[in-house]
Design a protein with these regions (language model features):
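Conserved N-terminal entry element of GNAT/NAT acetyltransferase domains
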Residues: 1-36, 196, 207, 212-215, ...
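Active-site rim helix/loop that mediates acceptor-substrate recognition in acyltransferases
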Residues: 30-63
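Conserved acyl-donor/pantetheine-binding loop and adjacent beta-alpha core of acyl/acetyltransferases
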Residues: 58, 67, 71-110, 114, ...
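Short, well-ordered beta-strand micro-motif
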Residues: 65-67, 77, 179-183
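Conserved acetyl-CoA-binding loop-helix of GNAT-fold acetyltransferases
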Residues: 106-109, 115-132
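Conserved GNAT acetyl-CoA-binding A-motif
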Residues: 123, 130-152
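C-terminal "cap" of GNAT-fold acetyltransferases
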Residues: 153-160, 165, 170-227
Length: 227
C-alpha cells in the first residue's frame, strides 16, 4: 500500500466528506469537539460540518488527509493548541507550560484501513507541517493502552505509536492519558513551506521494501513540496 498525505483544503473537501460519511466521523462531530467542546452535540450536524468546511477554506488548514490512491483513508486534526480552546478545559490535558505548541488531538481512519500504518503516515506528515507553521513543539494526547482499565475511545491515538515516532511524556495527570510532546521541531522546518508535506510510498508501520519488520523511528528531514 502506498499512501500520500495532504493538507485539508477546499480541493480535498469532497474526499473528507466521503471518509467521514453521514455520521461526520462520530456522532456528527466533524472534528469540532476540541474547538467548541460538548456543544457540538447540541448543534445541527450541518453546522459542525460547515464550520470545518470554512476552516478548510481558510489560510490555516485544520488537519491532514491520508490517501490510498484517490481514496481518503485517514484524517488527523492538526492546529496550534491556541485554536483548540476546549483542551484548556480538560483537567488532564491542560497546558503543561506557556510554549506555543501545535496539537494532534484526534484521528479517524477508515475501518478497512485500521492497523495498516495510516496513523503512522499522518504523524510523520504532521511533524514537518507543524514545523513549517513555526511550531516549537508538537503535542499529542493519546491513550496509554498498557494501563489497565484504559478508555476504549481511541480517537486521540495510542501512546505506543507516538513513542516510536520520538514523542515523550511531559505530563501524566490521569494514568491512561499522558500528554506527549516532540521537540524541538526546528530541524524539520523548510523555508517557504506553508502546507503540510506530502508523503508517498508508505508501506505500513515498520516495514521495509522486502516486507520484513524493521525498527520504527522518526524519519530524518526530507525534501517536501507545498500543496
Amino acid at each position: 500500500m502506498s499512501l500520500t498525505v495532504k493538507s485539508l483544503t477546499s480541493e480535498w473537501w469532497p474526499a473528507l466528506e466521503g471518509l467521514f460519511g453521514r455520521a461526520g466521523a462520530s456522532n456528527g462531530c466533524w472534528c469540532m469537539y476540541w474547538r467548541i467542546g460538548p456543544r457540538y452535540r447540541d448543534r445541527p450536524r450541518a453546522d459542525n460540518r460547515d464550520d470545518l468546511r470554512q476552516l478548510a477554506a481558510s489560510d490555516q488548514p485544520p488537519g491532514l488527509l491520508a490517501f490510498d490512491g484517490d481514496l481518503a483513508v485517514g484524517w488527523c486534526e492538526l492546529a496550534p493548541r491556541a485554536d483548540l480552546a476546549w483542551l484548556g478545559h480538560s483537567r488532564f490535558l491542560g497546558p503543561v507550560d506557556d510554549l506555543p505548541v501545535w496539537s494532534l488531538p484526534c484521528f479517524y481512519v477508515r475501518r478497512t484501513y485500521r492497523g495498516r500504518g495510516v496513523t503512522d503516515a499522518l504523524i510523520e506528515a504532521a511533524v514537518p507541517a507543524a514545523a513549517a507553521g513555526g511550531a516549537p513543539a508538537l503535542e499529542a494526547y493519546p491513550v496509554d493502552t498498557a494501563v489497565p482499565g484504559h478508555t476504549t475511545n481511541l480517537f486521540p491515538g495510542v501512546a505506543a505509536v507516538f513513542a516510536r515516532h520520538g514523542f515523550g511524556v511531559v505530563a501524566r495527570r490521569k494514568p491512561d492519558r499522558p500528554v506527549m510532546r516532540l521537540s524541538p521541531l526546528a530541524r524539520w522546518r523548510r523555508p517557504g513551506l506553508r502546507q503540510p508535506s506530502v508523503l508517498s510510498g508508505r508501506r505500513g508501520p515498520g516495514r521495509s521494501r522486502s516486507g520484513r519488520r524493521r525498527r520504527s523511528r522518526l524519519p530524518p528531514p526530507r525534501r517536501a513540496r507545498a500543496r
